[in-house]
């Protein structure tokens, strides 16, 4: 497919290291096959130059709906190995946080829908994620109580 570079604009993915390989239309969802690859960095442990090792099993990253169907990105991340200290490292992207599989844009959409007072099961169904993910995002919010005034009517039970 010659137009795969337009997918980054369509999905608003700004990471230049993600290369899209193919799009598969399943019966229930769309799968975008991509790989994350860049030059080997220096080792964060010993400082020597790491080498490209292989790719991880694809991460199944849920993404926003496209053309009315749930979309997920099957992202193969490059692994790097330091031959000096034998440590391994996985390529990182701005699409998702380190050691996470829910993209930042989905987390923003969850927060937006929680503010709109949509039920958690509806949010999970609309974004093709689990209800527990929505609950975890709700627990990330910090609610402040305003104790600067008292209510007009107060009652005590004796």
Which ranges hold each PLM region?
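Short, positively charged, Gly/Tyr-enriched micro-motifs
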Residues: 60-158
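Short, conserved DNA-binding cores of transcription-related domains
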Residues: 1-87, 93
């Amino acid at each position: 497919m010659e137009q795969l570079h337009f997918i980054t604009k369509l999905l608003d993915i700004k990471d230049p290291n993600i290369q899209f390989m193919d799009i598969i239309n399943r019966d229930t969802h769309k799968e975008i096959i991509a790989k994350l690859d860049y030059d080997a960095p220096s080792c964060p442990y010993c400082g020597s130059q790491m080498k490209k090792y292989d790719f991880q099993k694809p991460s199944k990253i849920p993404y926003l709906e496209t053309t009315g169907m749930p979309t997920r990105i099957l992202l193969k991340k490059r692994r790097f190995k330091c031959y000096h200290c034998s440590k391994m490292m996985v390529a990182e992207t701005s699409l998702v946080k380190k050691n996470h599989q829910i993209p930042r844009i989905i987390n923003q959409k969850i927060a937006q829908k929680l503010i709109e007072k949509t039920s958690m099961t509806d949010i999970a169904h609309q974004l093709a994620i689990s209800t527990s993910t929505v609950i975890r995002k709700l627990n990330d919010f910090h609610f402040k109580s305003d104790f600067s005034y008292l209510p007009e009517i107060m009652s005590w039970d004796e």
